[in-house]
Amino acid sequence: MATVDRWLLPDGIEEVLPPEAARIETARRRVLDLFQRWGYELVITPHVEFLESLLTGSGQDLDLRTFKVIDPLSGRQMGLRADITPQVARVDAHTLRREGPSRLCYAGSVLHAKPQALSTSRSPIQLGAELYGDASASSDLEVISLMLEMLELADVPDVHMDLGHVGIYRGLAKAAALSGEAEQRLFDALQRKAMDEIEQLTAALDPALASMLRALARLCGGRETLDDARHALAAAPAGVQAALETLATVADQLALRYPQVPLYFDLGELRGYHYHTGMVFAAFVPGVGQSIAQGGRYDDIGADFGRARPATGFSTDLKTLVGLGNADLTTPVAGIWAPYGDESGLWGAIRDLRRQGERVVQALDGQSQADAAQLGCDRQLQLSNGIWTVASLAS
């Protein structure tokens, strides 16, 4: 192996160096503190689990993004986590087993076998919050509000929200008695807004249902979209009407809480359709093609762990959040340079300063004071009249 190959990293795998690593860690602490103030408890899940647990309740996409290895102890196949959400669902359903609502949050590195989009990282730091045990619109409102508070804390500018509800399409597809294959083909056409293809796929359906399914591709835009949807879907089944009202209720409350955040609706955009069961939402900023934070309701995820619970939540990539935000994440780097040696009182003075929160760098044997500035020190610890005191580095 050539020397150059020893330090090359795989495509999409990054290391974070000073001072950026300190900025990311500061952001992580601030966001987790925010979650804690909202009542969310931190959980730390393992980097690797048996594959069945990691892929529970997820679609094929997560399977393709998961690195697989063989456990040398058990011989079973394991996966390196590509998404922390299923792990937290396992914690809620199988480990905690609480009866009432449970609020959990997390932050940790994940690894993707394949990037989610062109030029995206395969080693993001996933950060998120989940609310289990409540099926009402109030929990959807809470997690979306918390996500917006997180983006505000990071000072991400020009955020706009995209809201939808997969229950609308699910209800119409069920009423039309579409086969699994037909439902998937129509879903794909809706994502591309391929109107000719949508017309063809719905041609043999009941005219009223066909009209409503075709309307989904056109129901996108601002707040007026919901009024248009009420008219276009007036004959839809009760479940579709309920989903539309949930969407409207949450949107109204968000508009009151965050009037500065534009809301956009697209009833044909079914993000996470094979995973989510209710409201879906995502935050976007100009100039970035992918959502910067996203989430939704996924009420069936705990079933494979023996305990289905209503659930909703969101996640983001912490590195992306820091890169887009304008929050001041700098940490004081000034420090005190302490000399090398074992003079009386030196070690005690160094320990006292560190306990007071000072950053103290002690010289190594043979290291000169000339290195102090490079190490971020602007002061020095010196012996004066038998007492160790802090003075300017220039003195």
UniProtKB/Swiss-Prot annotation:
Any Gene Ontology biological process: L-histidine biosynthetic process
Homology family: Belongs to the class-II aminoacyl-tRNA synthetase family. HisZ subfamily.
Gene: hisZ
NCBIfam families in alphabetical order: hisZ_biosyn_reg, PRK12292.1-1, PRK12292.1-4, PRK12421.1
Localisation: Cytoplasm
Protein name as annotated: ATP phosphoribosyltransferase regulatory subunit
Main location: cytoplasm
Stretches assigned to coiled coil: none
Gene Ontology CC terms, in alphabetical order: cytoplasm
SUPFAM superfamilies, alphabetized: Class II aaRS and biotin synthetases
